């Protein structure tokens, strides 16, 4: 019988940070990724108008929130504790096509900036999971007859 391996929260955080470092991911890369991605989003014909309606004026708070989000995801810094879904639910005109485009831009940004293939794979895997979760929450409408109602 193998012994169960118990690790403290500090040990798990240290392991995640070591994994990130091995991929070449640190706070500086997260900042680069977020800044470059949202530069592309703002210039995008499909996503730009959605974000322009949601973020008026100073983009810095949103960028900082996204940096905190990814820092918490990758480095376990705990800097993000928000609830992003309600904000997305409040966006008028948001469709599944917007999520597809968001993923395309995110993937292209990763291809252009990621410090390693492992980092690219790690980030896109998480982004796809997040997008799928949001899409289920925003667009899934069960049909009581056993199917799915497509809006």
Predicted regions: what they are:
Residues 1-151:
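Core of compact, soluble alpha-helical bundle domains
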